[in-house]
């Protein structure tokens, strides 16, 4: 099976693959060459995921801008 380019994966697919790569690298069983290859793939996946998140944020900002009363605020994970 051919590996898809990171930009052609959905956000969820990229995140799942990135999680797998991190897990494999943390185990420490990969050779140096394999580790570098996985690291390179991980960087590409992280970049593509970041780009997809930025696009989603822009879409939300545009949608929120259509309603002048709406205020876009930062997410606070500590709120209960």
Swiss-Prot record:
The keyword Signal does not apply. It catalyses: Exonucleolytic cleavage in either 5'- to 3'- or 3'- to 5'-direction to yield nucleoside 5'-phosphates. It comes from Pseudoalteromonas translucida (strain TAC 125). It comes from the Bacteria. Its main location: cytoplasm. PANTHER family: EXODEOXYRIBONUCLEASE 7 SMALL SUBUNIT. It is found in: Cytoplasm. Heterooligomer composed of large and small subunits. GO terms for biological process: DNA catabolic process. This is Exodeoxyribonuclease 7 small subunit. Its EC number is 3.1.11.6. Keywords: Cytoplasm, Exonuclease, Hydrolase, Nuclease. The keyword Mitochondrion does not apply. Bidirectionally degrades single-stranded DNA into large acid-insoluble oligonucleotides, which are then degraded further into small acid-soluble oligonucleotides. GO terms for cellular component: cytosol; exodeoxyribonuclease VII complex. Belongs to the XseB family. One of its GO terms (molecular function) is exodeoxyribonuclease VII activity.
